[in-house]
Amino acid sequence: ADAAGIVRPGIIIRTKEYAFVTSPVAATVRYAGPLSDYGMVSILEPSEGILFIFAGLNKVFGEPGQILPEASLVGLMGGENINIENFTTEKELNSGRLSQSLYIEVRRNDEPQNPFDWFEFNKEE
């Protein structure tokens, strides 16, 4: 369940403030913007019938129909006071705080899939 107690078919991972969220593979942007109670969302289609949904972003990048190469920036996580001074200070960049929540959902032909079958997650030390 998420912070509101809603059970969703994806997973929630903790990220650092201001973390970049990138496309794991080349994909077409299907949507980038606000989506009901998911906040700012980026929906990518790496192949026909497959959707990667990234939600909980502070800012999204890309336009619907845009084809993104692998590792392209699709979003930016939020933080307490997002501004260029905080973003670039060594203290902020090296704080290691995992205070943001990124929701990841995978769908195949509109059926939820287990994200762990699609992504490799490494715990940062």
Ranges and model annotations:
Residues R14-T15, F54, N58-G62:
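Short alpha-helix capping/helix-loop boundary micro-motifs
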Residues S23-N58:
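Zn2+-dependent peptidoglycan hydrolase active-site motif and core
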Residues A1-S23, E92, S101:
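Short glycine/threonine/proline-enriched tight-turn/helix- or strand-capping micro-motif at secondary-structure
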